């Protein structure tokens, strides 16, 4: 299976870069998945969790909002704010707390925020 290149960038710098099997993005019209060979598109992202599947694990990045450019072989994400939640990390609890704060500050839509927060807590 061909791998997709992905980069997640915020104004302060790069949050994540790598080659992945798939990525699920929180689009403003709903979540959508991207695999290698996807049609080209540019879309707006809402507050949510980017789900990244690598060859041997799943990784998650919480964002408050941003843009994604998708091409056949790569996904470039420019977010206003992002927190990389590493599954096997000593600062995981701190990352989850920062992600919750980022999302709570991102939207006044309490229902949408609580849904994303529940997703983060289940990671």
Curated annotation (Swiss-Prot):
<dbReference type="InterPro" id="IPR020546">
    <property type="entry name" value="ATP_synth_F1_dsu/esu_N"/>
</dbReference>
<comment type="subunit">
    <text>F-type ATPases have 2 components, CF(1) - the catalytic core - and CF(0) - the membrane proton channel. CF(1) has five subunits: alpha(3), beta(3), gamma(1), delta(1), epsilon(1). CF(0) has three main subunits: a, b and c.</text>
</comment>
<dbReference type="GO" id="GO:0005886">
    <property type="term" value="C:plasma membrane"/>
</dbReference>
<keyword id="KW-1003">Cell membrane</keyword>
<comment type="function">
    <text>Produces ATP from ADP in the presence of a proton gradient across the membrane.</text>
</comment>
<dbReference type="InterPro" id="IPR001469">
    <property type="entry name" value="ATP_synth_F1_dsu/esu"/>
</dbReference>
<dbReference type="Pfam" id="PF02823">
    <property type="entry name" value="ATP-synt_DE_N"/>
</dbReference>
<protein>
    <recommendedName>
        <fullName>ATP synthase epsilon chain</fullName>
    </recommendedName>
</protein>
<dbReference type="GO" id="GO:0046933">
    <property type="term" value="F:proton-transporting ATP synthase activity, rotational mechanism"/>
</dbReference>
<dbReference type="GO" id="GO:0005524">
    <property type="term" value="F:ATP binding"/>
</dbReference>
<comment type="similarity">
    <text>Belongs to the ATPase epsilon chain family.</text>
</comment>
<keyword id="KW-0139">CF(1)</keyword>
<keyword id="KW-0375">Hydrogen ion transport</keyword>
<dbReference type="GO" id="GO:0045259">
    <property type="term" value="C:proton-transporting ATP synthase complex"/>
</dbReference>
<dbReference type="InterPro" id="IPR036771">
    <property type="entry name" value="ATPsynth_dsu/esu_N"/>
</dbReference>
<keyword id="KW-0472">Membrane</keyword>
<keyword id="KW-0066">ATP synthesis</keyword>
<keyword id="KW-0406">Ion transport</keyword>
<keyword id="KW-0997">Cell inner membrane</keyword>
<keyword id="KW-0813">Transport</keyword>
């Amino acid at each position: 299976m061909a791998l997709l290149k992905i980069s997640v960038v915020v104004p302060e710098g790069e949050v994540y870069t790598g080659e992945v099997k798939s990525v699920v993005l929180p689009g403003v019209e709903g979540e959508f998945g991207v695999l290698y060979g996807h049609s080209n598109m540019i879309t707006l992202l809402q507050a949510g969790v980017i789900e990244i599947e690598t060859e041997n694990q799943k990784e998650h990045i919480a964002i408050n909002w941003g843009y994604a450019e998708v091409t056949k072989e790569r996904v470039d994400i420019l977010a206003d704010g992002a927190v990389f939640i590493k599954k096997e990390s000593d600062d995981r609890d701190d990352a989850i707390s920062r992600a919750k704060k980022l999302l709570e500050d991102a939207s006044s839509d309490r229902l949408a925020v609580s849904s994303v927060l529940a997703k983060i807590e289940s990671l």
